């Protein structure tokens, strides 16, 4: 097919621009590029056809220097790796007329006031914008051809807000920038053109939103705390247990140090846009059996794994056993949550429940469908007005009730312990009951150990310092902390430390005011079992009806009395 000469008019599709699609109402305004068949035909002509271009070059050289274009900013463009958001711009009639390689502008949900009120930006032509920002054959950089999209601005420290500029950034891959910083592309020593950007403009260029006091949700900051600036020594102040190689941070995520109160910790932040529905994982860590979990231990980075609706085991990401997912902090309330914990085939995954923008922290919590399944306390659930909160039916106004015997416990921990070691849950699997008390066991050897240690007072483990004996080696190890001074259990409310978790548990009740042990005679409550028993022995000795009619001994509780009576029955 013969190509027309440059002087001939080339038929093109007529483009109709609606009156509401003016540059003042759109964040990005471009006119379609003409067909490049003219330029291909011009290059095939003789030398005389270039005379008009040489005259134009001479006129441009004689003209005075053109000052920098007085625009404030250019609208950001989507990079090829990001998903396109459907905006009202794409519904315009002229959008379908654009060539397939045309760079698609990103239109924010609302146009900032500084764009709609700027006459310089509204009057700028598309060719000027393309020459100043997009490129072209000039000194500012290489030209971006039709088959390439404009890359997003680099996450350089000089472009970040002041709060994030002083933070400690751990990228997932080594930086490709030179240590000396960016160098001007002009080889003649001329400084490149500089533009004055306000903080409002900078947020719009980098994130596509404008921070304002009316919309605090659009601000990007460390939600779980304040960003910690690096120390004067220049070190990154990383803990000894943090192994950068084992973190395996995905592309687009980074690790920053934040502080909440006076306690510094780490958080995972987003360095590039993350769409809704992206899944990370699985969560890695040490497999811990349910019987090995300490009730008042550090279980902050531990997830429950369920099989057939029952708790199977835990995955503990504490220390160096976990990957980067163990540094994702929990959300304080549902509105700041952007990740949902999902269990799939015995593994825990984090899935984004909303769009996560650059420099936002990743915050995880359970999904709505997992609250009841994973036994989250009712106080953490959000109940809509007019609806009753969903909670465990076994919890009454008094506490947690045993369905077999009717006993009520103040805490679920004690009710579960009661169900574990009493015949109330005997479904045929506990075939070995103790003849001296009411406890029953699944295996014969467990019953033998129980009788040996509890009833016969067998204490084979002796302390070499004080001579005290214990039935189990673990009890001896806990006792040795008294002599060595080791106190590994610290109170979270004060600075006191203790040798055993049971002592810490009793101490914490002084701060919380909890008194789970209630006297059945007078109704007085106590924080520890020892204080309760001491009160019964001192105040209700005469009122206690649990007295042995054979030897005259008096017992404070019925279980001890029944165990004592077994000895008289056997003899």
Swiss-Prot record:
Which terms under GO biological process does the entry name? cell fate specification; cell morphogenesis; embryo implantation; fertilization; fibroblast growth factor receptor signaling pathway; germ cell development; germ-line stem cell population maintenance; homeostasis of number of cells within a tissue
Q: Where is this region: Interaction with CBFA2T2?
A: 194-384
Instruction: Give the Phosphoserine positions (modified residues).
Output: 79
Tissues where this protein is expressed: Expressed in embryonic stem cells. Tends to be overexpressed in breast cancer (at protein level).
- Domain SET, residue spans: 251-367
Q: Where is this region: Disordered?
A: 129-191
Cellular component aspect of the GO annotation = intracellular membrane-bounded organelle; nucleoplasm; nucleus
This entry's Enzyme Commission designation comes to 2.1.1.-
Keywords noted in UniProt: DNA-binding, Metal-binding, Methyltransferase, Nucleus, Phosphoprotein, Repeat, S-adenosyl-L-methionine, Transcription, Transcription regulation, Transferase, Zinc, Zinc-finger
Per UniProt, the C2H2-type Zn-finger stretches lie at 400-424, 432-455, 461-483, 489-511, 517-540, 546-568
Query: What is this enzyme's class at the first EC digit?
Result: transferase
Q: What is its main location?
A: nucleus
* Purpose: Transcription factor that has both positive and negative roles on transcription. Required for the maintenance of embryonic stem cell identity and the reacquisition of pluripotency in somatic cells. May play an essential role in germ cell development at 2 levels: the reacquisition of potential pluripotency, including SOX2 up-regulation, and successful epigenetic reprogramming, characterized by EHMT1 repression. Its association with CBFA2T2 is required for the functions in pluripotency and germ cell formation.
| Protein name per UniProt | PR domain zinc finger protein 14
Organism the protein comes from: Homo sapiens
> What lineage is this protein's organism placed in?
Eukaryota, Metazoa, Chordata, Craniata, Vertebrata
Whichever gene encodes this chain, its name is: PRDM14
């Amino acid at each position: 097919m013969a190509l027309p000469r440059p002087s001939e008019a080339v038929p093109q599709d007529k483009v109709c621009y609606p009156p509401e699609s003016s540059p003042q109402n759109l964040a990005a305004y471009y006119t379609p590029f003409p067909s490049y068949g003219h330029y291909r035909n011009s290059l095939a002509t003789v030398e005389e056809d270039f005379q008009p271009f040489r005259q134009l070059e001479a006129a441009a050289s004689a003209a005075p220097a053109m000052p920098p274009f007085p625009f404030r900013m250019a609208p950001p463009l989507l990079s090829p790796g990001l998903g396109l958001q459907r905006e009202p711009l794409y519904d315009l009639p002229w959008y379908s007329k654009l060539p397939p390689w045309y760079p698609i502008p990103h239109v924010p949900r609302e146009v900032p006031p500084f764009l709609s009120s700027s006459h310089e930006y509204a009057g700028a032509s598309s060719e000027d914008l393309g020459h100043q920002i997009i490129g072209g054959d000039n000194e500012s950089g290489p030209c971006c051809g039709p088959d390439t999209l404009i890359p997003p601005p680099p996450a350089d420290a000089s472009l970040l807000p002041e709060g994030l500029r002083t933070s400690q950034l751990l990228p997932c891959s080594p930086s490709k920038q030179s240590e000396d910083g960016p160098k001007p592309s002009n080889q003649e020593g001329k400084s490149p053109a500089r533009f004055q950007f306000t903080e409002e403009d900078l947020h719009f260029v980098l994130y596509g939103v404008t921070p304002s006091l009316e919309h605090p949700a659009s601000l990007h900051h460390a939600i779980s705390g304040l960003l910690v600036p690096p120390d004067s020594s220049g070190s990154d102040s990383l803990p000894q247990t943090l192994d950068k190689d084992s973190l395996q941070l995905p592309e687009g995520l980074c690790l920053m140090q934040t502080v909440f109160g006076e306690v510094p910790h780490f958080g995972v932040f987003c360095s590039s846009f993350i769409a809704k529905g992206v899944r990370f994982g699985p969560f890695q860590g040490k497999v811990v059996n349910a019987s090995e979990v300490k009730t008042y231990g550090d279980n902050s980075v531990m997830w429950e794994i369920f099989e057939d609706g029952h708790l199977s085991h835990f995955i503990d990401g504490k220390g160096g056993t976990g990957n980067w997912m163990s540094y994702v902090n929990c959300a304080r309330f549902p509105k700041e949550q952007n990740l949902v914990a999902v269990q799939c085939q015995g593994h825990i995954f984090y899935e984004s429940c909303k769009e996560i923008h650059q420099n936002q922290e990743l915050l995880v919590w359970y999904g709505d469908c997992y609250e009841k399944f994973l036994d989250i306390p009712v106080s953490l659930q959000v109940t809509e007005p007019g609806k009753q909160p969903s909670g465990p039916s076994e919890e009454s106004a008094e506490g947690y009730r045993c369905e077999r015997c009717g006993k009520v416990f103040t805490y679920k921990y004690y009710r579960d312990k009661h169900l574990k070691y009493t015949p109330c849950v005997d479904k045929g699997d506990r075939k070995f009951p103790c003849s001296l008390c009411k406890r029953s066991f699944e295996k014969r050897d467990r019953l033998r150990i129980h009788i040996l240690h509890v009833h016969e007072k067998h204490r084979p483990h002796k302390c070499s310092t004080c001579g005290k004996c214990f039935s189990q080696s673990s009890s001896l190890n806990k006792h040795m902390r008294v002599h060595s001074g080791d106190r590994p259990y610290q109170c979270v409310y004060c600075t006191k430390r203790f040798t055993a978790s049971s002592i810490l548990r009793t101490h914490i009740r002084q701060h919380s005011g909890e008194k789970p042990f209630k006297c059945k005679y007078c109704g007085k409550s106590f924080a520890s079992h020892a204080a309760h028993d001491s009160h019964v022995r001192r105040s209700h000795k005469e009122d206690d009806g649990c007295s042995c009619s054979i030897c005259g001994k008096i017992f404070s509780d019925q279980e001890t009395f029944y165990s004592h009576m077994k000895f008289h029955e056997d003899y």
